[in-house]
């Protein structure tokens, strides 16, 4: 007779293990599970653990050729979500051997690759991941990190200022370069290609790179400060992306840019390695993130995408504003901002942090506040984000009634006034408007 019984069996018999003690080397995941009516939460949690690790819908004889106990994911704890009906947080532990070293792509393919279409679930959201230090050490991470960036730019003790060039599509390369020059000349540290500026018929990438580099050097010579423009190297193929990065390096510019979700983690990690080897800073835009993270009960929370970016590599990443035109709750946003910047972050459920995360020596990433912010937000932004951040004003610079350079001046003056007021112990939340008014005289 055959040594196993064929047929369908409940996942929870194998994959729900409440007695399991998690290991320091396990990757831990917190899933928000919404089971279909009639499906018990233990079965739903176990199904997630199974389908994202070793399981399939039936017993197979080849299970006997390996040690499931060594390789299976385990749902080790389930708790109901307060205030929600039929929603649970299922905690799953994955043995480290299930994942390829240094590959965010493989990590996501395993953990979220297949399980989200699962029939037994009405919806599923990955809320957080604990990346064990043993796995963290297989990643290069950000090309340079916060301290090295400050040293390269020679800018300390304040947030950095950026601006996205608008209109984002339709300008010729020459006019685009002119706008870059005006903003940098006015006092900004950086200007930025919009995420969808790649290489279109009205402005090919090489022309844009050349005119922006010229603008950069002219502004640098006139202000005596180091300036940067995020040259978007995102392209249709990895080879083309690399070609653009190489050309940027030849021009001697300090920073380039990539859309990491649309470009993909594999391309992004390659680019991050190139940037470290060649002394380029890497600005990351999160285009497409809301497709994945906006639904409260389905998808992947942005804090997971932020952690993945820190592993894959980037020196800046857009992280919401708390005060502008795009969604983002203050405590939750500050939670993942700390996950980007700090070496060690304690578990804190009020800030959405489900696990203590130790990044060991992985460099930090500067959060970028961008989207519908303007000079009157400056006190709040300075207070919320602190010094290690990039504040980006697109329309908030180029929309200045006197033009781009005065827009840049206004932002720089407002920022320096806020930083000085904070250093003198003034209350930015209460006196913010007054501080800006005084500075603008």
UniProtKB/Swiss-Prot annotation:
SUPFAM superfamilies: RuBisCo, C-terminal domain (SSF51649), RuBisCO, large subunit, small (N-terminal) domain (SSF54966). The modification N6,N6,N6-trimethyllysine is found at residue 5. GO terms for biological process: photorespiration; reductive pentose-phosphate cycle. CDD domains: RuBisCO_large_I. It is found in: Plastid, Chloroplast. GO terms for cellular component: chloroplast. Its main location: plastid. It catalyses: 2 (2R)-3-phosphoglycerate + 2 H(+) = D-ribulose 1,5-bisphosphate + CO2 + H2O; D-ribulose 1,5-bisphosphate + O2 = 2-phosphoglycolate + (2R)-3-phosphoglycerate + 2 H(+). The record marks 325 as: Transition state stabilizer. Its cofactor is Mg(2+). Heterohexadecamer of 8 large chains and 8 small chains; disulfide-linked. The disulfide link is formed within the large subunit homodimers. RuBisCO catalyzes two reactions: the carboxylation of D-ribulose 1,5-bisphosphate, the primary event in carbon dioxide fixation, as well as the oxidative fragmentation of the pentose substrate in the photorespiration process. Both reactions occur simultaneously and in competition at the same active site. The basic functional RuBisCO is composed of a large chain homodimer in a 'head-to-tail' conformation. In form I RuBisCO this homodimer is arranged in a barrel-like tetramer with the small subunits forming a tetrameric 'cap' on each end of the 'barrel'. HAMAP family: RuBisCO_L_type1. This is Ribulose bisphosphate carboxylase large chain.
């Amino acid at each position: 007779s055959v040594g196993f019984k064929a047929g369908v069996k409940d996942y929870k018999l194998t994959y729900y293990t409440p007695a399991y003690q998690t290991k320091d080397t396990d990757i831990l995941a917190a899933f928000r599970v919404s089971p279909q009516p009639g499906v018990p939460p233990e079965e739903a949690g176990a199904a997630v653990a199974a389908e994202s690790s070793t399981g399939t819908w039936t017993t197979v004889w080849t299970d006997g050729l390996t040690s499931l106990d060594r390789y299976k994911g385990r749902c080790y704890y389930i708790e109901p979500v307060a205030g929600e009906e039929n929603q649970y947080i299922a905690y799953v532990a994955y043995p480290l051997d299930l994942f390829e070293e240094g590959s965010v792509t493989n990590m996501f393919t395993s953990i979220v690759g297949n399980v989200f279409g699962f029939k037994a679930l009405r919806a599923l959201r990955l809320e957080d991941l604990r990346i064990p230090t043993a796995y963290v050490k297989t990643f290069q991470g950000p090309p340079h990190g916060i301290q090295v960036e400050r040293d390269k730019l020679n800018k300390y003790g304040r947030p950095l200022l950026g601006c996205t060039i608008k209109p984002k599509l339709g300008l010729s390369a020459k006019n685009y370069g002119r706008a870059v020059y005006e903003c940098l000349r006015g006092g900004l540290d950086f200007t930025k290609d919009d995420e969808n500026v790649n290489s279109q018929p009205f402005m090919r990438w090489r022309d844009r790179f050349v005119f922006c580099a010229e603008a950069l050097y002219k502004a640098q010579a006139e202000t005596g400060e180091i300036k940067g423009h995020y040259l978007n190297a995102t392209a249709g193929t990895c080879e083309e992306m690399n070609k653009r990065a190489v050309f940027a390096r030849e021009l001697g510019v300090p920073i380039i840019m990539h859309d990491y979700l649309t470009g993909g983690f594999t391309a992004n990690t390659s680019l991050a390695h190139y940037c470290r080897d060649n002394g380029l800073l890497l600005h990351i835009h999160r285009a497409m993130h809301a497709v994945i993270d906006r639904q409260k009960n389905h998808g992947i929370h942005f804090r997971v995408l932020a952690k993945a970016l820190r592993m894959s590599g980037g020196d800046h990443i857009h992280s919401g504003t708390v005060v502008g035109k795009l969604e983002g709750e203050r405590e939750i946003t500050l939670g993942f901002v700390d996950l980007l910047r700090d070496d060690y972050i304690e578990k804190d459920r009020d800030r959405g942090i489900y696990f203590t995360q130790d990044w060991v020596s992985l460099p930090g990433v500067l959060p970028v506040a961008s989207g519908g912010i303007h000079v009157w937000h400056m006190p709040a932004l300075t207070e919320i984000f602190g010094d290690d951040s990039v504040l980006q004003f697109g329309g908030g610079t180029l929309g200045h009634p006197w033009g781009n350079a005065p827009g840049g001046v206004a932002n720089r003056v407002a920022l320096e006034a806020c930083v000085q007021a904070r250093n003198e112990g003034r209350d930015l939340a209460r006196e913010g408007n007054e501080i800006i008014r005084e500075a603008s005289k």
